[in-house]
């Protein structure tokens, strides 16, 4: 009890009461009501969260983000997209050379300069094993290396990912199955959700703790190096800025957002989010088409 009391008063001395936010909400993870400190960092997913269904960002959302950035709030967009694809959507916001977490945490780079901050991909050896396993079962797979997409040969299923890509896929034939470089990510597309779940189980049973798998969208199976997640990538940036998890607000809508929703001290799922994301979040806000993220930020930061 004495140790806890000392810690509490030390924290209070560092962060006076008047600096605490007036926002209250029910934290399901702790089963208690919390008073939240001023938010210093926003971690925001793109597709289905910030972006409208037509892939646009509303003027209202752009204005709120600009106000938050001007106020000194650190803004990090965390997406499953390729960096080049995310960059096209985010440059018009004019938020400076901010970090963008891409490939669900496997690649972080600066928005304007394109400087790569970190990469955490699948080794060529492991990638070769996975591709051989996938090939034997005739599953359709795409790899991403140095922000370019690769396939063995053209396939109609490739079009399912085309809306998230601005660079043409590179077809390499037999060489595709023998990568010479680190693979940032692999994607398998499967429209049949039962088959999708079976594929995931086969992969997890075969490769176990050597890979990490998430569903960024209903028909996509993302394969990453074990340990890759949005939370880990965001945590690295937060540590550099000396920002604690309780000072972060995160916004998401799908399974690949769960890690950061659980990591952030304050987490929000949009109304259109999948049930697993809503369960992981502290609160549900307006949908992506209703600018739910922007309205929540405006309330939290009193913009």
Show the residue positions of the predicted features.
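Active-site phosphate-binding/coordination module
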Residues: 59-158
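Asp-based phosphoryl-transfer active-site loop
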Residues: 38-53
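Short, acidic loop-to-helix structural element flanking the phosphoryl-transfer center
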Residues: 55-73, 119-126, 169, 227-239, ...
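Short, Lys/Arg-enriched N-terminal segments with co-localized hydrophobic residues
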Residues: 6-10, 14-34
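Short, structured coil segments at secondary-structure junctions
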Residues: 93-96, 104, 207, 263-264, ...
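Mg2+-dependent phosphoryl-transfer enzymes with acidic/Ser/Thr/Gly-rich catalytic loops
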Residues: 36-41, 58, 222-303
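Conserved acidic, metal-coordinating active-site core of Asp-based
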Residues: 129, 133, 137-251, 255, ...
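Hydrophobic packing residues within well-ordered alpha-helices of enzyme cores
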Residues: 61, 86-90, 199, 203, ...
């Amino acid at each position: 009890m004495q140790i806890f009391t000392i810690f509490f008063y030390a924290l209070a001395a560092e962060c006076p009461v008047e600096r605490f936010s007036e926002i209250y909400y029910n934290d399901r993870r702790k089963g208690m009501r919390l008073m939240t400190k001023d938010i210093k960092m926003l971690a925001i997913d793109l597709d289905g969260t910030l972006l409208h269904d037509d892939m646009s960002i509303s003027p209202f959302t752009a204005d709120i983000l600009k106000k938050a950035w001007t106020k000194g709030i650190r803004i990090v967009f965390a997406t499953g997209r390729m960096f080049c694809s995310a960059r096209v959507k985010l440059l018009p916001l004019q938020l400076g050379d901010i970090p963008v977490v891409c490939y669900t945490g496997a690649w972080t780079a600066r928005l304007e300069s394109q400087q790569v901050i970190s990469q955490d991909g699948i080794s060529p050896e492991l990638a070769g094993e996975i591709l051989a396993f996938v090939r034997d079962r005739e599953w359709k797979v795409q790899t991403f290396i140095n922000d370019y997409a690769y396939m063995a040969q053209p396939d109609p299923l490739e079009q399912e990912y085309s809306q998230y890509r601005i660079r043409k896929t590179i077809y390499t034939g037999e060489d595709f199955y023998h990568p010479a470089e680190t693979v940032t990510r692999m994607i398998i597309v499967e429209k049949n959700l039962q088959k999708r779940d079976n594929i995931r189980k086969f992969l997890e049973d075969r490769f176990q703790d050597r890979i990490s798998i998430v569903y960024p969208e209903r028909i996509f199976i993302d394969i990453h190096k074990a340990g890759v997640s949005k939370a880990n990538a965001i945590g690295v940036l937060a540590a550099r800025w000396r920002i604690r998890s309780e000072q972060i607000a995160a916004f998401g809508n799908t399974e690949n957002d769960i890690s950061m929703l659980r990591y952030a001290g304050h987490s929000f799922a949009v109304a259109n989010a999948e049930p697993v994301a809503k369960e992981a979040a502290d609160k549900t806000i307006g949908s992506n088409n209703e600018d739910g993220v922007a309205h929540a930020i405006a309330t939290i930061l009193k913009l």
